[in-house]
Each structure stands twice: as C-alpha cells, then as structure tokens.
C-alpha cells in the first residue's frame, strides 16, 4: 500500500490523511524497523505491507466504532502499538491505554509516545487479566488485534469495559467463535453487530464483532490466564 493508496483507502473509511499524519506514520514505521532489529516485534517490515497490514488495518476500527468523540479506549496485547497507538496518533480526542506484558515492547511504546508527544496515551506493562482486577468498568471501548479466541478475549478483558461500553476485537474470520450465547450471558454482554470486510489490495478477510456490556462483570472474573486457557482452548 503506497502513499496514494493509503490516503485513498483511508478516505473510504472517512479518515482524511494530511501530510503531517502521513509523515508521522512514516516516522513510526522507520522507528519500528529500527527497534525491530533488537526486539523482534513484527515479521512484517516492508513499508507498503506495514502501511496496509498494521496501520490501515488498525484504523479500520474507526469505520464501525465512533472515534470522533471524547472517549477512553484500551488496547491490550498491543505489541508494537496496533491498533491503539495508531489510533492515538490520528485521533487525539481518544484517551488510549495500551496494555502490554513485554517490557521490551513497552520500552518501544514509551519511545513512540515521547517522540510524538502523545499526552493521550498511557502505557501499562502488565497482562490484561491482572490489570483488569483493579481497573474494572473503566473504558468506553476495549479492543485488541489477533490476540486469541473470542471466548478467551471475553474473559480476559470484559471486566475493564464500562457498563454501556463496547468490546470490539479485530479478528480475521472468527464467525465460528461467535455462537456461545451462554458465555455472553455469563459476562453480561450483548453481541450487537458483526462487521465483515476485506482488506484492500490483499483482499484478506477481517471481522470485528462488537459486544455491548449491559451490567457489571462478576468479581470472580477474570481468572488467571492458565485457568482461562484450559477452559476455552479447543
């Protein structure tokens, strides 16, 4: 995805990319490549691929969830900042909390925050299920990208979503993971929509299931990670 394609396809999802925005993303890309040689954060390093598979893919959330407002967003398992840091860079009105367990990746995220002077970004070096114990019902939107299966995501992160807020993970094709209505009831979630689309150029399938939280999460959740995985892994 070259510059012209990136600007064009962002416009199709109602994001107007100006020169500064593009230059900031280009700088982000260059820093990613530089730090990746030390910390191995991504296997995708070619510029056009990063703009498509990391930057554009991250921004697709804004097509389906209103980010043009004052709101709080948590991105867990963010890695090198996808989708949360990209959203924070282009949507300064969104207060973004990035939760990442890797100290090395958190170092990179802190560097990006400093380089771009992102006052709307908070970086937490923790596992989401540990962070969620003392940060309950906190965020308007909670998201992640390609972290794990939907049932595991639900238990890991639902406690951090405000009542009335949204859990909206970015996934590839996950329709076979969306049939557990008893699980939604257990976590006081309502599946309000499933957005399906294809990434441009590659035409690879993407899915964003959107859950609305209708009541507080039972305090026994989330459990520790090994217990969660044992219950939901096939």
Where are these regions (language model features)?
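SAM/dcSAM-binding transferase cores
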Residues: 181-234
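Class I SAM-dependent transferase core
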Residues: 2-68, 74, 104-121, 224
